[in-house]
Amino acid sequence: RKVTSVALPDGERVANSIATAPQGTAVVTTHALYLLTEDSTGNPVVKYRVRYDRGSARKPGQLSWGSGSTPTFFGPVTGGEYLTLIDNADNQVHLLVVSTASGAVLCTTPVLTSGGPGSENSPIGAGRTVIAASTYGYPYPAVPDDAGPAVPATAPFIGGMTRVDVRPDNSGCDVAWTNTVRSAAVPKLSVADGTIVTVTRHNPVNDQLGTTPADKFFYAAVDPGTGAVLTEQLIGATTASDPIQTAGTTAPGGTIYQGTVTGIQRITPLT
């Protein structure tokens, strides 16, 4: 077996997952977005590198200094015309949409204006639409040893999602809505029934009081057209049910398997 690699610049590392499509493999490092393809001998090569604003430090609710995004391929025809990620700019994060073919940045759009400037999640991408979720201030039980200090050290978890649409002529992007959904998992779009599904987290007394070990967790369905919550159903309580911003898997029939800090939940939505 032959193993080949591409060296990153000094001080740059991969802290998130990667994404693959027929157009190549997308990698977000702590400094930039890369698209990797292969040369005539099958060795990996960098097609392009797109820098983003990594900010001045790791933020609370993120696990590394830099973008927390696994890059997302999306598009209206092939599903791979665009790539997207969320940067780590200090005071206001932005959603970047890049042409997969050329690496040209089509837009750098402010997002998550109500929930805090940070996201550790991979954005949803479908058609010309991207949906991002805030994890700013999320109380992870631990962070990687090499994560570095967060600035500030802690912050309240408010949550929130933003929908951004790429214009048909690729001249830019527009924000369609922003909500205050307190997503505790990586939101997923169910194209079969046209809903965003996730797990939400709520303080048992009042969300304004912040997160607590006694928080309750709910299966939630969100309307991608408006950002409104369609339903919430209690599925657990206390940090034993915390999905810590991990991604669930949807099985045939709509059943969701969601990991938590203590195991796996099987969630069958009520009809």
Protein language model annotation of sequence segments:
Residues D242-T271:
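Blade-level signature of beta-propeller repeat domains, shared across WD40, Kelch, NHL, RCC1
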Residues A7-G11, V45-S64, T108-G116, D174-S183, ...:
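Surface-exposed loop and turn segments in beta-propeller and other repeat-based domains
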Residues E81-D87, E120-T239:
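Loop/turn-rich, solvent-exposed surfaces of beta-rich toroidal or solenoidal domains
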